[in-house]
C-alpha cells in the first residue's frame, strides 16, 4: 500500500461489498528495525485485517529500504519464517521488487526464503506480488515460489511463440497467434470484428498465460524437462549464465 487515499476505512468498505475467499492484509510499507520488528509489523497488519473479514488473511511481508537503494533482501527468509510461525497462513506474500535488483538475485532470495521455511512441520506456500514475466515466473517457481500476480497480462502484448513481452500497441503483429488460441473464448474474441483491440489483446495474453503456466507446472515435475523448458524460454546462451548464477536452483 503506497497511496494515502487508500485508507483502512476504504479497504473495509471494499471487503464488505466484494465476495472473496481470501484477503491480502492491509499492509504497511517501509518497515524499520531488525528481523523481529519487521516480522512484528507484518503480523500486526495481518491481525488487524483479520478483524475486518471472516475469510483467511494473507500476510504481506515488506522489507526495510537500504540507504544505497533497494531492500534488505537478506532479511527475507528469517522474517518470512517468523510470520509463518506466528500466523500459519494459507499463503505468505512478498513483493517481487523487494527480493533484489536482478532476476538472479531475486531467485536466490526466493531460494533462501524456501530454505528458511523448512522444518515448520507443514508446507508454507509463498505468493510473489507483482510478478508476471514468464522468465521470472519460471525461475522463482524453481526456487520455491507457489503463486503469483502481476499486471503484465494487461500492459503488454505477448509473442506466444517466443514467450516475449512487447509494447501493447504491437499486438497486431501477433494476431495470427490469437486466431489459433486454445481457449474458445479467446479464439472467438479474435475473430469477432465487434470486439475491441484492447479486449482482443488481453484475451490473447490470458490464453498465452494459461498455456505457458500449464507447461511450467508440467516441467517442474522433472528436472530434465524443466531445464529444456527454461533453455527454450531464456535468450540464446543465457542458460549457461543462469546455471552459473543459481547453483542451488538449477
Where are these regions (language model features)?
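Glycine-rich phosphate/ribose-binding loops and adjacent secondary-structure elements
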Residues: 52-190
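Residue-level preference for long, well-ordered alpha-helices that form the structural scaffold
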Residues: 3, 34-38, 72, 102-109, ...
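Extended aliphatic helical segments
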Residues: 35-38, 43, 57, 61, ...
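Surface-exposed alpha-helical segments enriched in charged/polar residues
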Residues: 12, 44-47, 81, 111-118, ...
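C-terminal extensions of enzymes
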Residues: 23-33, 184-250
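Generic detector of ordered, mature protein regions
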Residues: 36, 70, 102-107, 139-142, ...
Amino acid at each position: 500500500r503506497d497511496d494515502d487515499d487508500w485508507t483502512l476505512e476504504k479497504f473495509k468498505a471494499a471487503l464488505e461489498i466484494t465476495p472473496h475467499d481470501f484477503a491480502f492484509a492491509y499492509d504497511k510499507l517501509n518497515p524499520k528495525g531488525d528481523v523481529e520488528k519487521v516480522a512484528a509489523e507484518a503480523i500486526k497488519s495481518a491481525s488487524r485485517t483479520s478483524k475486518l473479514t471472516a475469510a483467511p488473511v494473507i500476510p504481506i511481508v515488506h522489507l526495510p529500504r537500504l540507504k544505497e537503494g533497494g531492500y534488505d533482501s537478506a532479511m527475507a527468509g528469517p522474517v518470512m519464517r517468523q510470520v509463518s510461525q506466528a500466523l500459519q497462513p494459507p499463503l505468505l506474500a512478498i513483493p517481487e521488487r523487494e527480493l533484489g535488483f536482478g532476476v538472479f538475485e531475486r531467485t536466490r532470495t526466493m531460494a533462501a526464503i524456501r530454505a528458511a521455511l523448512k522444518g515448520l512441520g507443514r508446507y508454507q506456500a509463498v505468493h510473489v506480488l507483482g510478478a508476471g514475466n514468464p522468465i521470472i515466473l519460471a525461475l522463482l517457481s524453481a526456487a520455491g515460489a507457489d503463486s503469483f500476480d502481476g499486471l503484465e497480462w494487461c500492459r503488454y502484448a505477448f509473442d506466444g511463440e517466443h514467450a516475449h513481452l512487447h509494447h501493447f500497441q504491437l499486438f497486431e503483429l501477433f494476431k495470427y497467434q490469437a486466431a489459433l488460441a486454445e481457449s474458445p473464448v479467446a479464439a472467438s474474441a479474435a475473430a469477432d470484428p465487434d470486439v475491441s483491440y484492447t479486449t482482443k489483446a488481453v484475451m490473447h495474453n490470458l490464453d498465452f498465460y494459461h498455456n505457458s503456466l500449464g507447461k511450467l507446472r508440467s516441467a517442474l515435475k522433472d528436472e530434465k524437462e524443466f531445464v529444456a523448458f527454461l533453455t527454450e524460454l531464456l535468450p540464446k546462451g543465457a542458460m549457461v549464465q543462469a546455471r552459473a548464477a543459481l547453483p542451488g536452483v538449477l
